[in-house]
Structures are given as structure tokens and as C-alpha cells.
Regions:
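Conserved ABC ATPase "signature" region
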Residues: 113-131
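Helix-to-loop junction immediately C-terminal to a conserved catalytic motif
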Residues: 50
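Conserved ABC transporter NBD signature motif
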Residues: 57-65, 74
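Conserved ABC ATPase signature
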Residues: 135-139
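Catalytic Walker B motif of ABC-type/P-loop ATPase nucleotide-binding domains
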Residues: 160-164
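The feature captures the beta-strand-to-loop junction immediately N-terminal to the Walker
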Residues: 35-37
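ABC ATPase nucleotide-binding domains
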Residues: 231-264
């Protein structure tokens, strides 16, 4: 049964519509990846869902209309991680994580000892325990992304929206972040919608893949269930001719790889 549903969503900037009549649903514990060329509407979709961008249509979370929620209540339910955090003040990494509790604190109320401990544990989970008291502005872009993920972990939100979270991360941390997101969705019985630049990551870590082109859904794939031929045909509409190969790691885990084929 779906716990998050988008119905007939259209959005754009000024008078230019970017998204046209987008509808999809998300099951508890699932991760949906969004793939598409630049300008296809991936970021616009996330901004519309989290209320940053005005839109037509409905976004329902546990049958609650997100458009009707005050910003504070919306922030309790939905966490959005953009490509760049926008934080430009001198503040420690730990204090950034503590921002995840802000929607649950009253005006002028300070985080409790339990909240501070939880923030420290979240930093440890993302491999940033030794950076707790480091100035956030002095962190690398990848470390900043991990710090923001830790903030999301403590927020208690059930829906996570991420805009190309792997773009600033090295090879090792890309996989670590996706594994943590999967773990988070399962533990919270929540869900994640992620725009991704790397289709191989998407194929191996997402339960479903939404392919966008010019603001419309081309196809929705299930990498663990769909035939390779079907996925190749769909992905080729975005990336040009591609082939998918099912490989095994040394530990025996099956993974999908994608290769670019020559143009006919």
C-alpha cells in the first residue's frame, strides 16, 4: 500500500512549465530514483513536492495533503537535501545536524542532551564523528553532504528528497551514502525520492526508476524485476544506445552495470 502519492503534478518557473502531469507512488521502505537529462525536470519535481515551488496537483503523505500543511509541520514530515546546502555562516558540523530538530523545538528552546547525543551518533553513522566540532564551511563538499544526511537522520521525517547526493562524493562514499539511505527507509518505514546522475548507482540501489524527459514520465522501471531488454530500451531513450550486464562481485552479490554502445 502506498504511503506517498503524487497526482497530476505540474510545475514550472514564471510562465514556463517544466513538469507536465506527473503521477507516481511510493511504498513504505522503498527508494525511487529519478533519471533524466539536464533540464528534464528532476530538481523541479523535488522542489515542488517539498513546497519550495508552487505547483498544480496533489502530494499525499499518509493521506495528508502536503500542500495544506504549514511549513513547520511539513518540515517534520519531509526532508529535502539540495545539491548545495546554502549554509554560509560559521557553525560547527554538530550544530548543523542539530538543525534537524528545529521543527520539533519551540521558539528559543535549546536542544536537549538526548538530542545532542543523537546528533553525535548520526555523525558517527555517516563517518563524520571526528568532524563534529569542525567549522561546517571548512568541510569538503562531500563532507557537507554527509553532514546534511546526518541532519536528516535525526529529523524524524518519513519522506526524504535528495537532489544528486552522489555528485560531490568520492567512489567509496557514494555507495556508503546509498546504503545508509536504504537502511534509513527500512528502519523508518519511510521512503526516499532521489535524483541521480549515475545510472549504475540507480540501477543497484533503487527499487524503482522514474525516467523523465521534457518534464514527462517516459517510463517507470523495477530493476530487480524487469527484463534487461526492457530496461535497455527505456534507458537508451535518455542515454543513447546502452547495454546492461549482470555481474557478480567476489562476495557473490549480483550487480548491474551499464555500457555505452556505438551509435548506429
Amino acid at each position: 500500500m502506498s504511503f506517498f502519492c503524487v497526482k497530476h503534478l505540474s510545475a514550472g518557473y514564471s510562465r514556463k512549465m517544466i513538469l507536465q502531469n506527473v503521477s507516481f507512488s511510493l511504498e513504505p521502505g522503498a527508494v525511487t530514483g529519478i533519471l533524466g537529462a539536464n533540464g528534464s525536470g528532476k530538481t523541479t519535481l523535488l522542489k515542488a513536492i517539498c513546497g519550495i515551488l508552487p505547483h498544480e496537483g496533489l502530494c499525499l503523505l499518509d493521506d495528508t495533503k502536503l500542500e495544506a500543511l504549514p511549513p513547520r509541520e511539513l518540515a517534520k514530515r519531509v526532508s529535502y537535501i539540495p545539491q548545495r546546502s546554502g549554509i554560509s555562516i560559521d557553525i560547527s558540523a554538530l550544530d548543523v545536524v542539530l538543525m534537524g530538530f528545529n521543527p520539533r523545538l519551540k521558539l528559543l528552546e535549546h536542544p536537549t542532551k538526548a538530542m545532542i547525543a543523537a546528533a553525535g551518533e548520526a555523525l558517527s553513522r555517516v563517518g563524520m564523528a571526528d568532524k563534529a566540532h569542525t567549522n561546517y564551511l571548512h568541510l569538503s563538499e562531500g563532507q557537507k553532504q554527509l553532514c546534511i544526511l546526518a541532519r536528516t537522520i535525526v529529523s524524524g521525517s518519513r519522506l526524504l528528497l535528495l537532489d544528486e547526493p552522489e555528485s560531490a562524493l568520492d567512489f567509496q562514499h557514494r555507495y556508503r551514502m546509498l546504503e545508509m539511505i536504504r537502511s534509513w527507509t527500512e528502519q523508518m518505514s519511510g521512503g526516499a525520492v532521489i535524483t541521480l546522475h549515475d545510472p549504475v548507482l540507480a540501477l543497484n540501489y533503487c527499487d524503482r526508476l522514474m525516467l523523465l524527459e521534457n518534464g514527462e514520465i517516459l517510463d517507470i522501471l523495477s530493476p530487480k524485476e524487469d527484463p534487461i531488454e526492457k530496461m535497455e530500451q527505456a534507458l537508451s531513450r535518455i542515454y543513447g544506445p546502452v547495454s546492461l550486464q549482470l555481474c557478480k562481485t567476489r562476495s557473490g552479490k549480483e550487480v548491474l552495470t551499464m555500457l555505452k554502445e556505438d551509435e548506429p
